[in-house]
Design a protein with these regions (language model features):
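Sec-dependent bacterial lipoprotein signal peptides
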Residues: 1-21
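Residues within mature, well-folded domains
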Residues: 23-170
Length: 170
């Protein structure tokens, strides 16, 4: 019976995450840059996973859809309290900006929280994975590899073999 309970709980969680991810386009369509306020954003998306102060009076609200989702949103609220930008940050263009030597704090701020973090004690490396969709609709993983000082060594992009959409051997 404990196995069945775990299975049922996992299925329920997966359904909730799937439904929540499916609501994002509706939530986004209800917001308008320059008019929507932080209250409007929080009413539609809930509390952010992280709030980043921008130094100019603006703040960026992080809405993370990892580990099950394939998008992360950064929504900027200007000093006037109005939304000035809404970006889905898990894109090939943003991945190309992640360079060797960059600190993990900067990577985290650009991409949001990763889906998975895997430390490798013997090599001293840590792998940070983000799930994303490569246009038009291919499930992929973007991996940032850091050293012990949390500096980027390299990045790589591979098919997301754990995705339910993957049709090859696992």
């Amino acid at each position: 019976m404990p196995f069945f309970n775990r299975l049922a709980s996992s299925a329920a969680l997966a359904l909730v995450l799937l439904v929540a991810a499916g609501c994002d386009p509706q939530r986004i369509s209800e917001l308008e840059e320059g008019l929507s306020t932080e209250v409007d954003v929080r009413d539609r998306f809930g509390p952010p996973d992280q709030v980043w102060d921008e130094g100019n009076g603006s703040r960026t609200l992080e809405y993370n859809r990892q580990p099950a989702g394939q998008r992360n949103y950064m929504i900027t609220i200007g000093p006037d309290g109005k939304m000035s930008a809404l970006r889905q940050v898990l894109t090939p263009e943003n991945f190309a900006r992640i360079q060797a030597g960059m600190g993990m704090d900067e990577v985290r701020r650009r991409l949001g929280k990763p889906a998975k973090v895997t430390p490798y004690a013997l090599s001293g490396e840590t792998h940070y994975d983000w799930r994303f969709l490569e246009p038009p609709n291919t499930a992929m993983l973007f991996t940032v590899v850091t050293d012990r000082s949390l500096r980027v060594l390299r990045t790589q992009t591979t098919p997301d073999m754990a995705s339910p959409d993957h049709n090859g051997p696992r």
